């Protein structure tokens, strides 16, 4: 399973839904890639 938008995540083990989402190192949640 992958993590949805604004879900808490770990930047060193990014499980956010690809390819749209990426784990923000600053905020520690899944954000849309710009």
Curated annotation (Swiss-Prot):
Tissues showing expression: Expressed by the venom gland.
Keyword Disulfide bond in record: yes
GO biological process annotation, one example: envenomation resulting in negative regulation of voltage-gated sodium channel activity in another organism
SUPFAM superfamilies given in the database record: omega toxin-like (SSF57059)
A GO-annotated cellular component: extracellular space
Domain of life: Eukaryota
Disulfides per UniProt: 2-17, 9-23, 16-30
Signal peptide positions (record): none
Main subcellular location: secreted
GO molecular function: sodium channel inhibitor activity; toxin activity
Assigned keywords, A-Z: Disulfide bond, Ion channel impairing toxin, Knottin, Neurotoxin, Secreted, Toxin, Voltage-gated sodium channel impairing toxin
Domain comment (free text): The presence of a 'disulfide through disulfide knot' structurally defines this protein as a knottin.
Protein family per UniProt: Belongs to the neurotoxin 10 (Hwtx-1) family. 08 (Gtx1-15) subfamily.
Function comment: Potent inhibitor of Nav1.2/SCN2A voltage-gated sodium channels (IC(50)=0.6-0.7 nM). Also weakly inhibits Nav1.1/SCN1A, Nav1.4/SCN4A, Nav1.5/SCN5A, Nav1.7/SCN9A and Nav1.8/SCN10A (IC(50)=20-610 nM). It acts by shifting the voltage dependence of channel activation to more depolarized potentials and by blocking the inward component of the sodium current. It shows low affinity for lipid bilayers. In vivo, this toxin causes general ataxia, lack of response to stimuli, and semiparalysis. After a few minutes, the mice are unable to stand, and breathing is reduced in rhythm and intensity.
Name of protein: Beta-theraphotoxin-Ps1a
């Amino acid at each position: 399973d992958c993590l949805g938008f604004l879900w808490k995540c770990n930047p060193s083990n990014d499980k956010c839904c690809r390819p749209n989402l990426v784990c923000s190192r600053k905020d520690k949640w899944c954000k849309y890639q710009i």
